[in-house]
Amino acid sequence: MTQSLTIRRPDDWHLHLRDGAMLEGVLPETTRHFARAIVMPNLVPPVVTGAEAAAYRERIMAALPAGARFEPLMVLYLTETTDPADVRAAAASGLVKAVKLYPAGATTNSASGVRDFDRVRGVLETMAEIGLPLCVHGEVTDPAVDIFDREAVFLERVLEPIRRATPGLRVVLEHVTTRDGLDYVRGGGPDMAGTLTTHHLIINRNHILAGGIRPHYYCLPVAKRETHRLALREAATGGEGCFFLGTDSAPHADAAKESACGCAGCFTATNTLSILAHVFEEEGALDRLEGFVALNGPAFYRLPPNEERITLRKGEPLVLPARIETGAGPVTLFDPGFPLLWHVES
C-alpha cells in the first residue's frame, strides 16, 4: 500500500485571497503548498482594469510570507463597460491570465457583473482572438429558477449561446457541481475546461441542511444531490485532462458565516491536499492526483508545469486548528468529517 507520493508542486486555478487584513491572514495557507493561483477579482470595488490588477498583485506580493515562492495569476472582472483594448494590453503584458464572468448577483460581490451579454460581445471577441480564457461562474440569477437547478439552466440559457456566438473562445466552467456541467465540459472540445473544488467532492446538500444548518458548508454554487457528488469524484479521479483543481477557497470571518444571513464560501486552502489525497486513495487513483492538481491546469492555460516537487506522506492523523486567526477575525477551516492521514512535505 502506498505510504508516500511525490508530485509536482500544485496550482490552484480558482482562489479567493480577499484584501487587507484578510489577505495577510489567509495567504500563507495557500503559499505553503501551492506555486500559483488564479486569483479571483471580486473585491469591493472589483478588479476591472489592468491597472487595478497590477495594484492588487502588488498588495499580494507585499503580503507574502518571508521566503515564500508564489505567483499570483491575475484575473479581470468582466463588466458591461470593460474596455477590449485594456483587456488586450493586460494580457499582452503577461499580467492577466483570464477574465471572470459573474452573472450579476450570482455570488459574493457580484453586483457589478453582467446583465446584458450583448454589451460584452466586443470583449469576448477580443479574448477569442488572443486566446485569453473566460472563467465562468455558471449559475443563472433568475429568481424563478430553483437554486439547485441554476447551473444546468445556465449552460442552456447563457453559456451555450455565448460559445456559439464567439467561436474560438476558451472557457473554464468553474466549480462544476452537477453531472450536467461535467457532461457539458466533456463535450466542449479543446477550448473547454472545468475546475472542481475540494469541498464539492466531500459534501452533498444533506451535509448543509440535515440535522441542523451548518453554515461552514454553505457555498455557491450550493452542494447538490449525492448522485452529483459521486459524479464529481469520478471526474476528478478519472484522469480526464479537461478537469483540474480550483479550490474556490473562500475565506469569510466566522461572524459573517454564523449569522442570520451568512456568507457563501468554504475555506479549504489549509487542508485541500490532504483531503484530496484521501479522496484519490479511496478511489484507487493516487497515480492520477498529480494530473489533477499540477498538470491539467497548466496545460489548459498554456503555462509550463512546476518543476518543484512536494511529497505527501501517510501517517498519524493530521492535527490542525479548527480555525485560523486573521486581522479580520477568525476563519473556520473546512471540516471534511474524517481524519486526515496524508501530510504534505515540501
Curated annotation (Swiss-Prot):
Pathway: Pyrimidine metabolism; UMP biosynthesis via de novo pathway; (S)-dihydroorotate from bicarbonate: step 3/3. Binds 2 Zn(2+) ions per subunit. Keywords: Hydrolase, Metal-binding, Pyrimidine biosynthesis, Zinc. Zn(2+) 1 binds at residues 14, 16, 100, 248. One of its GO terms (molecular function) is dihydroorotase activity. One of its GO terms (cellular component) is cytosol. The active site is at 248. Its EC number is 3.5.2.3. Its cofactor is Zn(2+). GO terms for biological process: 'de novo' pyrimidine nucleobase biosynthetic process; 'de novo' UMP biosynthetic process. Substrate binds at residues 16-18, 42, 137, 220, 252, 264. Zn(2+) 2 binds at residues 100, 137, 175. Belongs to the metallo-dependent hydrolases superfamily. DHOase family. Class II DHOase subfamily. Catalyzes the reversible cyclization of carbamoyl aspartate to dihydroorotate. This is Dihydroorotase.
